[in-house]
């Protein structure tokens, strides 16, 4: 793996191309997409992105659909809370 500087981190591979503000936006996105997330099934910190919107747990081998760059999205959280509220209203 190539040596990156402290300041630019994962976007050091782009060098001086594309402009500083775009590289900062890409850095935030790439850090979230390459990090590990907690698996909701087994509870381990092993959920990783396999492809765009596909998240795999390396411990329990579950595959779920999620966001493109982040496992949980704002829209998914909104839908989950709405469904929970409607379910409680029905009971």
Swiss-Prot record:
One of its GO terms (cellular component) is ribonucleoprotein complex. It comes from the Eukaryota. The keyword Cell division does not apply. It holds the Pfam family Ribosomal_L37ae. A zinc finger (C4-type) spans 39-60. Keywords: Metal-binding, Ribonucleoprotein, Ribosomal protein, Zinc, Zinc-finger. One of its GO terms (biological process) is translation. One of its GO terms (molecular function) is structural constituent of ribosome. SUPFAM superfamilies: Zn-binding ribosomal proteins. InterPro entries: Ribosomal_eL37/eL43, Ribosomal_eL43, Ribosomal_protein_eL43, Ribosomal_zn-bd. Belongs to the eukaryotic ribosomal protein eL43 family. This is Large ribosomal subunit protein eL43. The gene is rpl-37a.
